[in-house]
Amino acid sequence: MVNFNQFLKQAQTMQKKMQEAQEQMANTRYTGKAGGGLVEIIATGKGEVEKVSIDASLLKEEEKEMLEDLIKVAFNDAKQKCDADSQNSMSGALSGMSLPPGFKMPF
């Protein structure tokens, strides 16, 4: 059985590592691209869009629907990169913890 004081110390260490990982994620920028770079979105680790870049060739009425699709694809690309990085960061923060068998984390 794990000593309660040891468990508390591990929990404090895990909390500190998770806070550091969250701060690092918040300061990281993710670039999502679509249409071979015709549309780019830069988002923060918090999922906030900072910048949208659209190639001038897409700014025509007949390209409206394609542009809307490319913006969606670029945003989802940036979000997927952020989510993958978040999962890796949180997994790293939890390494070395003695968690009970079957314990699932909320992320």
Swiss-Prot record:
GO terms for molecular function: DNA binding. It is found in: Cytoplasm, Nucleoid. Its main location: cytoplasm. GO terms for cellular component: bacterial nucleoid; cytosol. The keyword DNA-binding applies. InterPro entries: YbaB-like_sf, YbaB/EbfC. Keywords: Cytoplasm, DNA-binding. Disulfide bonds: none annotated. Homodimer. Binds to DNA and alters its conformation. May be involved in regulation of gene expression, nucleoid organization and DNA protection. Belongs to the YbaB/EbfC family. This is Nucleoid-associated protein RBE_0048.
